[in-house]
Amino acid sequence: MEATTSLLDAAAVGDLVMLDPLSEESLLRTLQERFSRGEIYTYIGEVVISVNPYKPLPIYTPEKVEEYHNCNFFAVKPHIYAIADDAYRSLRDRDRDQCILITGESGAGKTEASKLVMSYVAAVSSKGEEVDKVKEQLLQSNPVLEAFGNAKTIRNDNSSRFGKYMDVEFDFKGDPLGGVISNYLLEKSRIVRHVKGERNFHIFYQLLAGGSAQLLQQLKLRPDCSHYGYLNHEKSVLPGMDDAANFRAMQDAMAIIGFAPAEVTALLEVTAVVLKLGNVKLSSCFQASGMEASSITEPRELQEISQLIGLDPSTLEQALCSRTVKVRDESVLTALSVSQGYYGRDALAKNIYSRLFDWLVNRINTSIQVKPGKQRKVMGVLDIYGFEIFQDNGFEQFIINYCNEKLQQIFILMTLKEEQEEYVREGIQWTPVEFFDNSIICDLIENSKVGILAMLDEECLRPGTVNEDTFITKLNQIFASHKRYESKETLNAKHVTDVSLPLRCFRIHHYAGKVTYNVTGFIEKNNDLLFRDLSQAMWAARHTLLRSLFPEGDPQRPSLKLPPTTGSQFKASVATLMKNLYSKNPNYIRCIKPNDTKTAMLFTPDLVLAQVRYLGLMENVRVRRAGYAFRQLYQPFLERYKMLSRKTWPRWTGGDREGAEVLLAELKFPPEELAYGHTKIFIRSPRTLFDLEKRRQQRVAELATLIQKMFRGWCCRKRYQLMRKSQILISAWFRGHMQRNRYKQMKRSVLLLQAYARGWKTRRMYRRYFRSDACTRLSNFIYRRMVQKYLMGLQKNLPPMAVLDRTWPPAPYKFLSDANQELKSIFYRWKCKKYREQLTPQQRAMLQAKLCASELFKDKKALYAQSLQQPFRGEYLGLTQNRKYQKLQAVAKDKLVMAEAVQKVNRANGKTVPRLLLLTTEHLVLADPKAAQPKMVLSLCDIQGASVSRFSDGLLALHLKETSTAGGKGDLLLVSPHLIELVTRLHQTLMDATAQALPLSIADQFSTRFPKGDVAVTVVESAKGGGDVPVCKKRGSHKMEILVH
């Protein structure tokens, strides 16, 4: 829905076929509006218009690739990925070879467009180790070729200075197998000269900026561009281009393609030779005869070049400063003047670089070409230099613009002229659309008899004095009345004055505009003459790569035949290219340059309008609006879509046209969408075609399911028959096997029964002579004797009856160890039982008290260890012997548990007073020892808890309930010499009386309740503490410190 909205947007439609009203102004306004939104792609039907934004845009992400993969061309926004996907699917699904023609001015973004197409095809094709390797090699050919074939021009920082056509070959699944690259007319004159504001080829700057110090030393180069005469010193560094990083990327790309390190080194050595040739300086001198000659001014550069290529410096110097002229059967060595020497030096540099570039392309082809014998489909991608109009246009611009005229001719013939002619041939009603046919311009240039290239070749081969003046004169004579040719002389003949046209220039009215060409250098560049002495010198070099570039230098193969001229070679190459393109289904990407300053997102309407006019976009829109988007012969159309109708599927016995009519009638498409020609079916709207293709895909899926069902059924039947046959065979063999096993088992059983019977008879006969159970009886006897001996020995060596003695004799035999341990345990339990039976009730009570004390104080209070050896007597006052104390016992009225003398700590001043403590089963009594009168009688139920310290003191704090009678005076602080026994008996008595344990706190600091409030008691271990009685000190009204020793 989003894409459809974009295509139908009234302000900026995505497809110019839908533009209403259609005019140059509305078309230009639409392109500008879309460009301002960042939408640089627009459709004219299936033609993509691309406007160069001169900045990166976030529209080439993997998510975008996924969005356009296998998608309807018009179901998504206009994008270069859409035409790449459409071409790829046509190649894969329709088995039609494709070519993608990318045209436009220099700087319009053609090279980037070709890389985007290649990267998209690589992304959507299948994955796999071998396939990924091929795709990576195809993609990595771009950085290598760009380094050696691209340069900065006035209009483009990365202008292709050669034409590149790549045929990518695929298998039937659409996986890339490899490819072949063809290159056309490298601008080798750029090696020796280029205009101000431009640069030489990228590789020179990359090598000097990115080469390591070791590499540059090996190539005898300096990292300073100003040192080399062939480099433009003013523009050596290009903003926004990292030459060092690009050099590393080129090296990585070469490794991926498969260049060996030795090949890379050899390639860079030859490149360095070209660069250093520009530093070879010549000076004028005179021979003895008075003839002018030349000599090398600075021999160092010559020596370094000679070292790089493995050639004697004198041989190279002789080749640069002289030439051999053959007169009949004699060879004469002629000295060259300085100008002739420089011409030879530059010609050598141009030829070395040009042939090195050809070798580079062939070497890449060696790595990426497909092995012969494989069936393959082809997608061609053409990236060639765009139309060029400079201030001074020479031979290179003439050749480049001729190539662009041929590409425009293809576009005209295949999209405008041929399409309209086809409608007439097929009898389709059609209103002709006027358009400019540039055949007249192509004929002006390439006519084999009177074309400009033919006249240039004739002038180059003509004997006598040959120069550009005779060439321009001949052109003026032949094309004096030609509508597309102008010169100073032809205009003067028509009485037209044009001061902008110099004498040695001619002007051609190209489809892209008028271009004025300066004929200076035409003959020289067309001849491309290289002295044979230089070729032979290169052949004599020991450098393997350089030697292979000059096979004509072999003295054993002399040839007097002149090599073909540059113009004739290029004309033949273009003809081959055009033939190749005509054999494929074309897909067009028309690139437009929005401004001349390479400014990001700047749109210059006048410049764009000029390109819209000469690219014929208006005519293209008119033809598309009036024409049909798809046409195909009836037979392949019916073969492809016949499964959509039950009447034509699976076989149609009638004619192909009748079958197509029956098929489309059943599908019920609108009549205006279809037209039936004499031999072809025509479909007007791409949407109708996409709907047809969508139905076919659904039907193919259904048929595939049907075929799978039938195949699975056939497989199941075959599998069943095989399993049934196998089951019968296995059953037969198994039954036989079972019968044989049964027979063997029966035989073994019979033999076994016979053996047992014979044995039984024999044993019965001789039983009285054998003692079969003697061994068992003997072993049982020995076992019983050993057990008896063990028990008797144990009886004699029993350990003492002391409970603390846990010794036990070891087992004499290993098999008795478990029994020995069990007897040890039984004996110890019996010994403990006997010990308990001997105890008196008083001893039992004391042991229980000791156990309770252990549970309360062990590892918690230091005094506990001293109480272990002290018996718990309970009564320490001698109440029965002392009559004075007997009346105290009467006060208690219940059973006495413990009686002892204690010290009571005064709550007011912390001083201690002696008291007698009597603990009975229900009360605790404190009495005056002198008067033997009770001072306090406490019920055990009134005791809330007790607190003691961790040290070895006898301090005890009894916490009383506030609600009790004695509790009103506060808690009690007592010092007992038998603290452990006192607390233990108090705990046991409380358990017996109330079934509740005594809450006991063992801490150095605890809180007590006195009449005047709570007091924090802190027990401190100190040398100042008293011996048996602690020292109590009050620290204010709420703190008390007790020092213990």
Curated annotation (Swiss-Prot):
<dbReference type="GO" id="GO:0005902">
    <property type="term" value="C:microvillus"/>
</dbReference>
<keyword id="KW-0009">Actin-binding</keyword>
<protein>
    <recommendedName>
        <fullName>Unconventional myosin-Ia</fullName>
    </recommendedName>
</protein>
<dbReference type="GO" id="GO:0016328">
    <property type="term" value="C:lateral plasma membrane"/>
</dbReference>
<feature type="domain" description="TH1">
    <location>
        <begin position="861"/>
        <end position="1044"/>
    </location>
</feature>
<dbReference type="GO" id="GO:0005516">
    <property type="term" value="F:calmodulin binding"/>
</dbReference>
<keyword id="KW-0505">Motor protein</keyword>
<keyword id="KW-0518">Myosin</keyword>
<dbReference type="Pfam" id="PF00063">
    <property type="entry name" value="Myosin_head"/>
</dbReference>
<dbReference type="GO" id="GO:0015629">
    <property type="term" value="C:actin cytoskeleton"/>
</dbReference>
<dbReference type="GO" id="GO:0016197">
    <property type="term" value="P:endosomal transport"/>
</dbReference>
<comment type="function">
    <text>Could play an important role in morphogenesis and function of intestinal microvilli.</text>
</comment>
<dbReference type="InterPro" id="IPR000048">
    <property type="entry name" value="IQ_motif_EF-hand-BS"/>
</dbReference>
<dbReference type="GO" id="GO:0016459">
    <property type="term" value="C:myosin complex"/>
</dbReference>
<keyword id="KW-0112">Calmodulin-binding</keyword>
<comment type="similarity">
    <text>Belongs to the TRAFAC class myosin-kinesin ATPase superfamily. Myosin family.</text>
</comment>
<dbReference type="GO" id="GO:0007015">
    <property type="term" value="P:actin filament organization"/>
</dbReference>
<dbReference type="GO" id="GO:0051015">
    <property type="term" value="F:actin filament binding"/>
</dbReference>
<dbReference type="GO" id="GO:0006897">
    <property type="term" value="P:endocytosis"/>
</dbReference>
<dbReference type="InterPro" id="IPR001609">
    <property type="entry name" value="Myosin_head_motor_dom-like"/>
</dbReference>
<dbReference type="InterPro" id="IPR010926">
    <property type="entry name" value="Myosin_TH1"/>
</dbReference>
<keyword id="KW-0677">Repeat</keyword>
<dbReference type="InterPro" id="IPR036961">
    <property type="entry name" value="Kinesin_motor_dom_sf"/>
</dbReference>
<dbReference type="InterPro" id="IPR027417">
    <property type="entry name" value="P-loop_NTPase"/>
</dbReference>
<feature type="domain" description="IQ 2">
    <location>
        <begin position="723"/>
        <end position="750"/>
    </location>
</feature>
<keyword id="KW-0547">Nucleotide-binding</keyword>
<dbReference type="GO" id="GO:0005884">
    <property type="term" value="C:actin filament"/>
</dbReference>
<dbReference type="Pfam" id="PF00612">
    <property type="entry name" value="IQ"/>
</dbReference>
<dbReference type="GO" id="GO:0005524">
    <property type="term" value="F:ATP binding"/>
</dbReference>
<dbReference type="GO" id="GO:0045056">
    <property type="term" value="P:transcytosis"/>
</dbReference>
<dbReference type="GO" id="GO:0007605">
    <property type="term" value="P:sensory perception of sound"/>
</dbReference>
<dbReference type="InterPro" id="IPR036072">
    <property type="entry name" value="MYSc_Myo1"/>
</dbReference>
<feature type="domain" description="IQ 1">
    <location>
        <begin position="701"/>
        <end position="727"/>
    </location>
</feature>
<dbReference type="GO" id="GO:0030048">
    <property type="term" value="P:actin filament-based movement"/>
</dbReference>
<keyword id="KW-0067">ATP-binding</keyword>
<dbReference type="GO" id="GO:0005903">
    <property type="term" value="C:brush border"/>
</dbReference>
<dbReference type="GO" id="GO:0005886">
    <property type="term" value="C:plasma membrane"/>
</dbReference>
<feature type="region of interest" description="Actin-binding">
    <location>
        <begin position="574"/>
        <end position="596"/>
    </location>
</feature>
<dbReference type="Pfam" id="PF06017">
    <property type="entry name" value="Myosin_TH1"/>
</dbReference>
<dbReference type="GO" id="GO:0030027">
    <property type="term" value="C:lamellipodium"/>
</dbReference>
<feature type="domain" description="Myosin motor">
    <location>
        <begin position="11"/>
        <end position="697"/>
    </location>
</feature>
<feature type="domain" description="IQ 3">
    <location>
        <begin position="746"/>
        <end position="774"/>
    </location>
</feature>
